[in-house]
Every structure is written in structure tokens, then in C-alpha cells.
Amino acid sequence: VSAWRNGMNNALPLAPVFSLTALVKACQVVASYAPLGNTSAAAPAKLHFFSGLWSNLADTFWGSPANIAAWVSVPVATSIIVNTNIDERVNTAVSRNPVWGRSTDTFFLQTGNFAAAVPHSILFVYGYFWGSGETAAAGAAGLQALGVNGAIVFGLKWASGRPRPVYDATTGTTQRDKEFNFNIAEQSIDSGRWRWPSGHTSSMFAMAAAFHGFYPDKTWIPFVLYPLSGLMGFAMINGNYHWTSDVVAGATIGTVVGFTIGRNFRRMYAGTQKSVTKIDGKPVLDWYVTPRQSEQGMALALTALF
């Protein structure tokens, strides 16, 4: 029809189009009778500790206005708590009348050295080798969050040089609450100046927030894990291992790092679910033909999906 409408000069260019149409139809007929074999979906690669590390690290600091505001609040809140004597008053109060005994404080201190990493380690190892990709991703999110959180907290501890609170029964006060040493050249492993921010608190909040970010639809997670993390933070104050401002800073840092990385791992996992169809273990090219028409004539568009 187009040939007659556009004149006989257009007849020859249309011939390859009609030949291509016949060839496509023939291929479709042959393919319909070909044995398919065992059709399966290619399993997407499972996420691990280093997946999206650099982009997650960047998002942690300036990925959103909320994150930026949280980081700004860390030194601001510390300054307010220190200069209004809240640190000294709270630690003095728990030194005079502790909520629980020393053995409980010691339990939290020792357990906090590894407790935050246990659930994520179990999920990752099981999910990566035997379970689902989602389970592995949930575990990897927490492990990466703990690693990033640990590096940040260690750097801040080294830079701030803050001593631990020590209650003086003679004066009835907890001194050195305003003491920081920002001269990193004077810092050392055995200096005892490693209190700001609280690593135990930040690790627990990073664990909780990573779960929260990865499983936002599980409403029980924030109501269970955040209070448990807060309990760890209070134990650090009750045992005079940390000042109140140490715990507040640690909780803020852990929450920002954990939730950001957990949320990003959920997005990365969702992106890996677009798998490629396979037949007998070999990828199959999915394609289709679409007719096109314009003022210049007719044609066929061949689209391939792989």
C-alpha cells in the first residue's frame, strides 16, 4: 500500500523490510518447536560486607538533610550537656545511688564488646552460604554499619582525648567532666582518654538501626532494639564508664550510620532481583519486533532484552 501511495520509486526500499518480516516469522516458528530444556532463573549475586561501601559512607555523612543535621547535633549536644553541668550531675547521682550493682555494669561492659555483631554475623554467614540473598544482605548491612561506625568512633575518640568519669567520695562530685585534649600527638593506647563518644552505645544503636533500615515494615524492631540499645547506654553511665554526653553522641552516630546503611542495603537487594532467564544454564536473549510507520515509509524495530 505504501509503495503505491508513495510511488514506484519507493517499492525497492520496502523489499528488505518485507524480507525481514518473513525471516522474523520463520525464526518464531522454528523457536516454537525447539526443545526448551530446563528453564531457570539466574540467581543474583549476594551482597557482602563491601557492597556499596563508598556510596554508603558518603550517604552516611551528607546523603540527606536529616543526616547532616544529626552530625551537626553531635558536637552541639555535647557542648550543651557539658557546659550545663549535666554530665557532672548525672554521673554524681548514679555514683551515689546506682540503679543496679557493679556486677551488672560489668556484664553490660563485657557483653557489649561483641553483642552487637552477633546477630548480623549469624544472618550473613547463614544467608550467604545456605540461606536466601535477603538474609545475607540483612547480615551484611549490619556488619558494614558496625565497621563504619567503629572507624568513625575510633577516630573521634583519638581526636577528643576525653577521660572517663571518676567519682570523688571526699568531695561528693565527679570531676574532669569538662576535660578534653584535642592534641592527637599526646594521645596513646594507654592514655585512658578514649571516652567520647561511647563505642558500646554506638555499636548497639548501629545494630538496631541497621535492622530498622533494612526491615522498615517490621514495626516491632524499633520498639524492641532501640530500648535495648538505650539500656546499654545507661549501663555505661551507671557504671561510670562514660559521661552522659558520651552516650548521647554514641547513640546519635550509631543510629545515623546504621539506618543509612541498612536502608541502602535494602535498596541494593531490591535491585538485584531482576534476574536473567536461563535455559540449560545458558542466558537467553529476549527480543521482540515492533512495526514502525512514518511519512517516509514502513519499517520494523528489533528490541533485545538481556
Q: For each predicted feature, which ranges?
A:
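Interfacial/capping segments of alpha-helical transmembrane domains
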Residues: 87-97
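Alpha-helical transmembrane segments
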Residues: 71-77
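Flexible, solvent-exposed coil segments and beta strand-coil junctions
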Residues: 97-102, 186-188
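Interfacial helix-start motif at the membrane-water boundary
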Residues: 101-121
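A generic alpha-helix surface/boundary motif
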Residues: 75, 88, 119-120, 150, ...
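Structural signal for the C-terminal ends of transmembrane alpha-helices
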Residues: 84, 126-131
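Alpha-helical transmembrane segments of multi-pass membrane proteins
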Residues: 78-88
